[in-house]
Amino acid sequence: MKLLGFCLATAAIFFFSDEIRGQQNLVMSDAVRPNAIPFQLEGGFLIEVEGRIGQLEGLKFILDTGATHSVIDRRIADRLSLTLRPKRVFNFDRFVRVDWAEFPDVQFGPIEVRNVSMMVSELAKSSELSGDADAIIGLDLLSTTSKVGIFYDSKMVVLRPRDVNAQGASERDKPECFTVEALVQGHDVRLLLDTGMEGILLYEDRIRKRIPSVRLTDERKGAFMGRLQGKTARLPGFRLDGPESDVMVFLLKGPRQDLLPGIDGYLGTASLKAKRIELDFEAKTMRWR
């Protein structure tokens, strides 16, 4: 189960091209070495880095741009003897009740956040892939950086801290959600970029409303993505940054219209087949190649 909050803003999308290859190569060489940390790919797509919570070091953190709020495994909260309080959050297609706690400090790479409120859950029950993780780091903490660069070829993440003097006190409470504009059979759709998802999830009712004549083949009901139950189908005419292709999608009924307005689903970063992704939280843009 992935626990989500609300997306309060979206970002524009830019694509890497051969003309700016020299510029994008500078992203890594220009980075100060302490800002670059290694990561491992868990399950072929989850980005896992080492982090610290309080005095607990060597913890496994998963960086997840599809989660608005960070989630800490319950055993970590128990080891820190933290007081829990219940609260409701939105999770893909419904509201769920989860516990929250105040953590003294959280650190991954050069990023250190103090006195932060985060969700607490039993991650092993949420996902087989993230069950070994100690925390899922969502946009609330990722957006305390100015930029996040994910380099799949070298298995490095570059985290550039913000200028604390330029960041408003309330900015941490308003994480940005990065969206990707794609074409489905000639129609524009908008998908949330999700490093914590492998494939493509579409809200079927929103897609059919946007594209009444949408063509789907090989539909199979009773499919599961974690705890989510929906169906799978082959979607022809899907285009991101290249020729159209047929893709397999997971279809789910969307939330009510005032939740995630204008969002048609989620795009797992593995679907981009990118070597490098850069998220710029200050300019509110994203690039990949």
PLM-predicted stretches and their roles:
Residues 16-289:
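Pepsin/retropepsin-fold aspartyl endopeptidases
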Residues 5-15:
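Bacterial N-terminal signal peptides
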Residues 1-3:
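N-terminal Sec-pathway targeting helices
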